[in-house]
Structure formats: structure tokens, C-alpha cells
Amino acid sequence: KTVNLPLWDQLKKEAIGFFDQMGGSKEAGKILFGLFFNGFYLPHELGHGVQFFVKGDEKGSYKNELFANQIGMQWWRKHGQEANLKSCYDFAQNIMGILPNPVPKGMTVEEYFNKNYDQVSSNPFIYGFLQFGQFIKVYNDKSLGDFDTLIRSYMGIK
């Protein structure tokens, strides 16, 4: 598996506009992008690497993204990145106040994500709603085991 690290200067104008809008300013948009895409999503992708190693190549699902977000969160906590996590959390809360909820009434976020993964993953507004919502959920989950415990549990090691 390969992790592609996006660089701010290589983003398309539309992507920069998205981050500027979600961050509230050009400066904040660049910080938002850096915190998530050059920071948090690196250990998040480590979570997907663990999934691939343990279970093989699985199609994207809500559960897979949740595990990757848990790994990303607990990796940063293990490495003393609480201040960066708090900054990400604050951005995520702001973004969730901006993005419309794409999930139809009568469906859960998980059902919608699983049934529409290809469409969801190709739309930054919908995918953002789901990813930033999961980030908030994981950040607030006080029952979540630490990084080492999550890895051992996923691999079936006691």
C-alpha cells in the first residue's frame, strides 16, 4: 500500500477554496489542511495499513474508516499531540456546522456511507461530513483503548 502525501502548493484551486471555506480564511484553510492531510491522516492511513495486513484488501466502509480514525487519534495521543488533536477537533466542529447533512432521513450515517461509498468518497463535502463527524466521535470516545491496545485487539493478540 502507498500513502500519497498531498502538498498545499499542488492542490487544485477548488480544493484550496474548500479548505479556505471550511477554515474560515485563507490562513486557517492552510492550517486546517496541514493539520489533517500532512498530520492526522498519516497515522489514519497506518490504520488502513493494519487493516490490509490483517484482513486483506477490503472495500471502504464506515467501520474501516472508524478504525483508521481511532488509530490516527490514539497514535497522536501516544506521541503527545494533544494540542494538534484539539486544533483538529475545533476545526472539525466548525466544519460540521457548515456542511449540510447528506444522510437521508431514516438512514444512519453508517448505512449511507456503506451503500454509497464510491459516490461519497468522490465528493469532498459529503466525505468531509462523514470523516469530520467520525473525528469528533472518536475524539470524544472515552472508552477507546490506547494505541497499543487497539492494535493488539484488532490483530487478535491479548
Each language-model region and where it sits:
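Soluble non-cytosolic domains of exported or imported proteins
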Residues: 29-41, 58-66
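Functionally constrained cores in energy, signaling, and assembly domains
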Residues: 4, 38, 143
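Long, well-structured alpha-helical subdomains associated
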Residues: 78-158
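An active-site-proximal "capping" alpha-helix that borders the catalytic cofactor pocket
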Residues: 61-78
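Surface-exposed, polar/charged faces of alpha-helical domains
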Residues: 55-56, 104
